[in-house]
Protein backbone atom coordinates (compact mmCIF):
# COMPACT_ATOMS: atom_id res chain seq x y z
CA UNK A 1 0.00 0.00 0.00
CA UNK A 2 1.28 3.45 -0.92
CA UNK A 3 1.28 5.94 1.95
CA UNK A 4 -0.22 9.25 0.91
CA UNK A 5 1.61 12.21 2.41
CA UNK A 6 0.81 15.90 2.65
CA UNK A 7 3.59 18.43 3.29
CA UNK A 8 2.84 21.55 5.33
CA UNK A 9 5.65 24.05 4.73
CA UNK A 10 7.77 23.98 1.57
CA UNK A 11 11.02 25.35 3.00
CA UNK A 12 14.39 23.58 3.07
CA UNK A 13 13.17 20.42 4.79
CA UNK A 14 9.79 20.37 3.04
CA UNK A 15 11.45 20.46 -0.37
CA UNK A 16 14.14 17.90 0.45
CA UNK A 17 11.50 15.57 1.92
CA UNK A 18 9.62 15.96 -1.38
CA UNK A 19 12.75 15.17 -3.43
CA UNK A 20 13.58 12.15 -1.29
CA UNK A 21 10.03 10.82 -1.61
CA UNK A 22 10.41 10.66 -5.41
CA UNK A 23 12.94 7.86 -4.93
CA UNK A 24 10.55 5.70 -2.89
CA UNK A 25 7.77 3.42 -4.09
CA UNK A 26 6.00 3.22 -0.71
CA UNK A 27 5.32 6.97 -0.31
CA UNK A 28 3.49 9.41 -2.56
CA UNK A 29 3.27 13.16 -1.95
CA UNK A 30 -0.30 14.16 -2.83
CA UNK A 31 -0.57 17.69 -1.42
CA UNK A 32 1.56 20.67 -0.38
CA UNK A 33 0.46 23.62 1.72
CA UNK A 34 2.58 26.77 1.71
CA UNK A 35 1.98 30.50 1.29
CA UNK A 36 4.14 30.46 -1.87
CA UNK A 37 2.23 30.49 -5.14
CA UNK A 38 2.49 27.38 -7.31
CA UNK A 39 4.79 28.92 -9.94
CA UNK A 40 7.35 29.96 -7.34
CA UNK A 41 6.98 26.60 -5.60
CA UNK A 42 7.81 24.87 -8.90
CA UNK A 43 10.87 27.09 -9.38
CA UNK A 44 12.21 26.39 -5.88
CA UNK A 45 11.68 22.67 -6.38
CA UNK A 46 13.42 22.64 -9.77
CA UNK A 47 16.54 24.55 -8.76
CA UNK A 48 18.54 24.13 -5.57
CA UNK A 49 21.89 25.79 -4.88
CA UNK A 50 22.99 22.98 -2.58
CA UNK A 51 21.51 19.82 -4.07
CA UNK A 52 21.33 20.77 -7.75
CA UNK A 53 18.50 20.49 -10.25
CA UNK A 54 15.46 18.33 -9.56
CA UNK A 55 15.73 14.98 -11.30
CA UNK A 56 12.36 14.91 -13.03
CA UNK A 57 9.70 17.10 -14.62
CA UNK A 58 7.94 19.94 -12.79
CA UNK A 59 5.02 21.86 -14.28
CA UNK A 60 2.17 24.02 -13.03
CA UNK A 61 -1.39 23.49 -14.23
CA UNK A 62 -4.52 25.21 -12.88
CA UNK A 63 -2.65 26.32 -9.76
CA UNK A 64 -1.36 22.85 -8.89
CA UNK A 65 1.99 21.10 -9.37
CA UNK A 66 2.42 18.33 -11.92
CA UNK A 67 5.57 16.42 -10.95
CA UNK A 68 6.70 13.53 -13.13
CA UNK A 69 3.18 13.52 -14.58
CA UNK A 70 1.38 13.30 -11.22
CA UNK A 71 -0.88 16.07 -9.93
CA UNK A 72 -0.13 17.43 -6.47
CA UNK A 73 -2.72 19.63 -4.81
CA UNK A 74 -1.37 23.05 -3.79
CA UNK A 75 -3.02 25.17 -1.08
CA UNK A 76 -2.06 28.34 0.80
CA UNK A 77 -3.85 28.06 4.16
CA UNK A 78 -2.47 29.68 7.31
CA UNK A 79 -4.63 27.53 9.60
CA UNK A 80 -3.97 23.77 9.29
CA UNK A 81 -7.53 23.06 10.45
CA UNK A 82 -8.77 24.27 7.05
CA UNK A 83 -6.60 21.98 4.95
CA UNK A 84 -9.15 19.25 4.14
CA UNK A 85 -6.46 16.58 3.92
CA UNK A 86 -9.15 13.91 3.67
CA UNK A 87 -10.20 15.26 0.25
CA UNK A 88 -6.92 13.96 -1.20
CA UNK A 89 -6.68 10.91 1.07
CA UNK A 90 -3.69 12.05 3.15
CA UNK A 91 -2.51 9.39 5.60
CA UNK A 92 0.36 11.32 7.19
CA UNK A 93 1.26 15.01 7.25
CA UNK A 94 4.91 16.07 7.31
CA UNK A 95 4.64 19.21 9.45
CA UNK A 96 7.58 21.23 8.12
CA UNK A 97 6.71 24.86 8.87
CA UNK A 98 8.44 24.86 12.26
CA UNK A 99 5.31 26.55 13.64
CA UNK A 100 3.14 23.66 14.82
CA UNK A 101 5.38 21.73 17.19
CA UNK A 102 2.95 20.91 20.00
CA UNK A 103 0.25 18.26 20.14
CA UNK A 104 -2.43 20.94 20.37
CA UNK A 105 -1.33 22.84 17.25
CA UNK A 106 -0.33 19.78 15.18
CA UNK A 107 -3.66 18.13 16.00
CA UNK A 108 -5.31 20.62 13.63
CA UNK A 109 -4.03 18.37 10.83
CA UNK A 110 -5.99 15.48 12.35
CA UNK A 111 -9.07 17.74 12.53
CA UNK A 112 -8.53 18.46 8.83
CA UNK A 113 -8.71 14.75 7.98
CA UNK A 114 -5.14 13.42 8.20
CA UNK A 115 -4.61 10.20 10.15
CA UNK A 116 -1.18 10.99 11.59
CA UNK A 117 1.41 13.79 11.81
CA UNK A 118 5.22 13.77 11.82
CA UNK A 119 6.85 17.00 13.03
CA UNK A 120 10.10 17.72 11.17
CA UNK A 121 11.71 19.30 14.21
CA UNK A 122 11.93 18.67 17.95
CA UNK A 123 8.56 18.97 19.70
CA UNK A 124 8.04 21.84 22.13
CA UNK A 125 5.88 19.78 24.49
CA UNK A 126 5.76 16.10 25.46
CA UNK A 127 5.00 14.86 21.95
CA UNK A 128 7.22 11.76 21.65
CA UNK A 129 10.35 11.99 19.53
CA UNK A 130 11.59 9.06 17.48
CA UNK A 131 15.04 8.64 15.94
CA UNK A 132 15.84 5.82 13.54
CA UNK A 133 18.61 3.69 14.98
CA UNK A 134 17.70 4.70 18.52
CA UNK A 135 14.07 4.15 19.51
CA UNK A 136 11.79 3.31 16.55
CA UNK A 137 10.95 0.09 18.43
CA UNK A 138 9.31 2.16 21.19
CA UNK A 139 6.61 3.55 18.87
CA UNK A 140 3.23 2.62 20.36
CA UNK A 141 0.66 3.88 17.88
CA UNK A 142 0.67 7.61 18.69
CA UNK A 143 -0.97 9.74 16.00
CA UNK A 144 1.36 12.73 16.44
CA UNK A 145 5.14 12.25 16.67
CA UNK A 146 8.35 14.20 16.14
CA UNK A 147 11.42 13.19 14.12
CA UNK A 148 13.56 15.21 16.60
CA UNK A 149 16.35 17.37 15.11
CA UNK A 150 19.01 16.68 12.49
CA UNK A 151 21.69 16.83 15.19
CA UNK A 152 19.85 14.43 17.51
CA UNK A 153 19.54 12.08 14.51
CA UNK A 154 23.33 12.17 14.19
CA UNK A 155 24.16 11.92 17.88
CA UNK A 156 21.63 9.35 19.13
CA UNK A 157 22.66 6.35 16.97
CA UNK A 158 26.34 6.89 17.79
CA UNK A 159 25.63 7.42 21.50
CA UNK A 160 23.52 4.25 21.57
CA UNK A 161 26.29 2.11 20.09
CA UNK A 162 28.86 3.52 22.51
CA UNK A 163 26.56 3.19 25.53
CA UNK A 164 25.42 -0.34 24.64
CA UNK A 165 29.01 -1.54 24.21
CA UNK A 166 31.01 0.44 26.75
CA UNK A 167 28.63 2.51 28.89
CA UNK A 168 28.63 6.31 28.96
CA UNK A 169 29.20 7.95 32.35
CA UNK A 170 28.83 11.48 30.97
CA UNK A 171 29.55 13.43 27.82
CA UNK A 172 29.67 16.77 26.07
CA UNK A 173 28.72 17.31 22.44
CA UNK A 174 29.63 20.09 20.06
CA UNK A 175 28.05 20.29 16.64
CA UNK A 176 29.86 22.34 14.02
CA UNK A 177 26.73 23.23 12.10
CA UNK A 178 26.16 24.60 8.61
CA UNK A 179 24.23 27.84 8.14
CA UNK A 180 20.43 27.59 8.24
CA UNK A 181 17.58 29.79 7.04
CA UNK A 182 17.05 31.48 10.41
CA UNK A 183 20.46 33.19 10.22
CA UNK A 184 21.21 36.62 8.74
CA UNK A 185 23.23 37.29 5.59
CA UNK A 186 24.58 40.47 7.26
CA UNK A 187 24.28 41.71 10.84
CA UNK A 188 20.62 42.16 11.78
CA UNK A 189 18.24 42.11 14.72
CA UNK A 190 17.83 38.84 16.60
CA UNK A 191 16.28 39.73 19.94
CA UNK A 192 16.36 36.27 21.54
CA UNK A 193 19.87 35.39 20.34
CA UNK A 194 22.12 38.40 19.84
CA UNK A 195 25.04 36.39 18.47
CA UNK A 196 22.67 34.59 16.08
CA UNK A 197 21.91 37.92 14.41
CA UNK A 198 25.48 38.39 13.21
CA UNK A 199 26.38 37.83 9.54
CA UNK A 200 26.30 34.11 8.78
CA UNK A 201 28.97 34.22 6.06
CA UNK A 202 31.38 36.29 8.16
CA UNK A 203 31.41 34.50 11.49
CA UNK A 204 31.77 31.35 13.52
CA UNK A 205 28.81 31.78 15.85
CA UNK A 206 28.46 29.96 19.20
CA UNK A 207 24.88 28.85 19.68
CA UNK A 208 22.70 26.74 21.92
CA UNK A 209 21.26 23.38 20.90
CA UNK A 210 18.90 21.04 22.67
CA UNK A 211 20.09 18.09 20.59
CA UNK A 212 22.24 16.43 23.26
CA UNK A 213 19.62 16.73 25.99
CA UNK A 214 17.00 15.43 23.54
CA UNK A 215 19.02 12.21 23.27
CA UNK A 216 17.87 11.58 26.84
CA UNK A 217 14.28 11.62 25.60
CA UNK A 218 14.86 9.06 22.85
CA UNK A 219 17.35 7.02 24.92
CA UNK A 220 16.17 7.33 28.57
CA UNK A 221 19.25 5.47 29.81
CA UNK A 222 21.29 8.54 28.77
CA UNK A 223 18.96 11.11 30.35
CA UNK A 224 21.02 13.70 32.26
CA UNK A 225 24.31 12.30 30.98
CA UNK A 226 24.76 14.44 27.86
CA UNK A 227 24.57 18.13 27.04
CA UNK A 228 26.04 20.23 24.28
CA UNK A 229 26.36 23.39 22.22
CA UNK A 230 26.78 24.42 18.61
CA UNK A 231 29.05 26.51 16.43
CA UNK A 232 27.31 27.86 13.34
CA UNK A 233 29.87 28.10 10.52
CA UNK A 234 29.83 29.73 7.05
CA UNK A 235 29.12 26.60 4.98
CA UNK A 236 25.81 25.94 3.18
CA UNK A 237 25.25 22.32 4.22
CA UNK A 238 26.71 19.32 6.09
CA UNK A 239 27.48 19.43 9.79
CA UNK A 240 29.61 17.37 12.16
CA UNK A 241 29.16 16.15 15.72
CA UNK A 242 32.08 16.05 18.15
CA UNK A 243 31.12 13.80 21.08
CA UNK A 244 33.48 13.62 24.04
CA UNK A 245 32.59 10.95 26.60
CA UNK A 246 33.82 9.19 29.70
CA UNK A 247 33.33 5.44 29.40
CA UNK A 248 32.30 3.03 32.16
CA UNK A 249 34.14 0.13 30.55
CA UNK A 250 37.71 0.73 29.41
CA UNK A 251 38.18 0.40 25.66
CA UNK A 252 40.94 1.15 23.19
CA UNK A 253 40.10 3.44 20.28
CA UNK A 254 40.49 0.40 18.00
CA UNK A 255 37.81 -1.45 19.98
CA UNK A 256 35.48 1.55 19.71
CA UNK A 257 36.05 1.71 15.94
CA UNK A 258 35.30 -2.00 15.64
CA UNK A 259 32.03 -1.66 17.58
CA UNK A 260 30.84 1.27 15.45
CA UNK A 261 31.85 -0.49 12.22
CA UNK A 262 29.96 -3.63 13.23
CA UNK A 263 26.82 -1.60 13.98
CA UNK A 264 27.14 0.35 10.71
CA UNK A 265 27.34 -2.90 8.74
CA UNK A 266 24.67 -4.61 10.84
CA UNK A 267 21.61 -3.42 12.74
CA UNK A 268 22.22 0.27 11.98
CA UNK A 269 22.94 -0.04 8.28
CA UNK A 270 21.46 2.95 6.43
CA UNK A 271 21.45 5.05 9.60
CA UNK A 272 25.00 4.90 10.91
CA UNK A 273 27.88 4.96 8.44
CA UNK A 274 31.61 4.36 8.91
CA UNK A 275 34.59 5.72 7.02
CA UNK A 276 38.37 5.59 7.33
CA UNK A 277 38.89 7.91 4.35
CA UNK A 278 40.37 11.42 4.57
CA UNK A 279 37.00 13.12 4.19
CA UNK A 280 35.83 16.74 4.50
CA UNK A 281 32.34 18.19 4.80
CA UNK A 282 31.40 18.44 1.11
CA UNK A 283 32.01 14.70 0.75
CA UNK A 284 28.75 14.18 2.64
CA UNK A 285 26.50 16.40 0.56
CA UNK A 286 23.56 14.14 -0.30
CA UNK A 287 24.42 11.51 2.33
CA UNK A 288 21.32 9.58 3.44
CA UNK A 289 22.86 8.09 6.60
CA UNK A 290 22.18 10.45 9.47
CA UNK A 291 25.50 9.76 11.18
CA UNK A 292 28.78 8.78 9.48
CA UNK A 293 31.53 7.94 11.95
CA UNK A 294 34.91 9.39 10.96
CA UNK A 295 37.36 6.82 12.29
CA UNK A 296 40.45 8.91 11.52
CA UNK A 297 39.18 12.13 13.12
CA UNK A 298 38.48 10.80 16.63
CA UNK A 299 41.05 10.60 19.42
CA UNK A 300 41.46 8.92 22.80
CA UNK A 301 43.20 10.46 25.79
CA UNK A 302 43.10 7.10 27.54
CA UNK A 303 40.89 4.00 27.56
CA UNK A 304 38.07 5.78 29.40
CA UNK A 305 38.04 9.24 27.81
CA UNK A 306 37.48 9.67 24.07
CA UNK A 307 36.45 12.18 21.43
CA UNK A 308 34.32 10.77 18.60
CA UNK A 309 33.47 12.51 15.32
CA UNK A 310 30.46 11.87 13.10
CA UNK A 311 29.25 13.68 9.95
CA UNK A 312 25.71 14.37 8.72
CA UNK A 313 24.00 16.09 5.83
CA UNK A 314 21.64 18.11 8.01
CA UNK A 315 19.15 18.39 5.13
CA UNK A 316 19.25 15.16 3.10
CA UNK A 317 19.96 12.68 5.89
CA UNK A 318 17.30 14.13 8.15
CA UNK A 319 14.67 14.39 5.40
CA UNK A 320 15.14 10.74 4.45
CA UNK A 321 14.59 9.73 8.07
CA UNK A 322 11.38 11.81 8.16
CA UNK A 323 10.14 9.49 5.41
CA UNK A 324 11.38 6.43 7.30
CA UNK A 325 9.39 7.55 10.35
CA UNK A 326 6.30 8.17 8.20
CA UNK A 327 6.63 4.62 6.84
CA UNK A 328 7.21 3.18 10.32
CA UNK A 329 4.12 4.73 11.91
CA UNK A 330 2.00 3.67 8.92
CA UNK A 331 2.64 -0.07 9.33
From Swiss-Prot:
The active site is at 150 (nucleophile). Changing residue 43 to I: In strain: ECOR 70. Signal peptide: none annotated. The record marks 177 as: Activates thiol group during catalysis. The keyword Plastid does not apply. Its EC number is 1.2.1.12. It is found in: Cytoplasm. GO terms for cellular component: cytosol; membrane. Changing residue 177 to N: Reduces activity about 50-fold. The modification N6-malonyllysine is found at residue 331. Changing residue 266 to D: In strain: E830587. NAD(+) binds at residues 12-13, 34, 78, 120, 314. It is an enzyme of class 1 (oxidoreductase). GO terms for biological process: glucose metabolic process; glycolytic process. The modification N6-succinyllysine is found at residues 115, 124, 132, 192, 213, 217, 225, 249, 257, 261, 331. The modification N6-acetyllysine is found at residues 132, 138, 192, 249. Keywords: Acetylation, Cytoplasm, Glycolysis, NAD, Nucleotide-binding, Oxidoreductase. Pathway: Carbohydrate degradation; glycolysis; pyruvate from D-glyceraldehyde 3-phosphate: step 1/5. Disulfide bonds: none annotated. D-glyceraldehyde 3-phosphate binds at residues 149-151, 180, 209-210, 232. Belongs to the glyceraldehyde-3-phosphate dehydrogenase family. NCBIfam families: GAPDH-I, PRK15425.1. Catalyzes the oxidative phosphorylation of glyceraldehyde 3-phosphate (G3P) to 1,3-bisphosphoglycerate (BPG) using the cofactor NAD. The first reaction step involves the formation of a hemiacetal intermediate between G3P and a cysteine residue, and this hemiacetal intermediate is then oxidized to a thioester, with concomitant reduction of NAD to NADH. The reduced NADH is then exchanged with the second NAD, and the thioester is attacked by a nucleophilic inorganic phosphate to produce BPG. This is Glyceraldehyde-3-phosphate dehydrogenase A. The lineage of its organism: Bacteria, Pseudomonadati, Pseudomonadota, Gammaproteobacteria, Enterobacterales. The gene is gapA.
Amino acid sequence: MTIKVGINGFGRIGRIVFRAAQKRSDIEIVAINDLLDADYMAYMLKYDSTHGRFDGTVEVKDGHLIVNGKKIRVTAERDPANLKWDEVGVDVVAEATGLFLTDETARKHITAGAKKVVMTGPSKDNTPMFVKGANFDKYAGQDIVSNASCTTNCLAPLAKVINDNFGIIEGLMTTVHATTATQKTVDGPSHKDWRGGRGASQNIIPSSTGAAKAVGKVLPELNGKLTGMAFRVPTPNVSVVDLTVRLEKAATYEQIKAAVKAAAEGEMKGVLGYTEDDVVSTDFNGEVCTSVFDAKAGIALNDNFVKLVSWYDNETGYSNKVLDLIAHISK
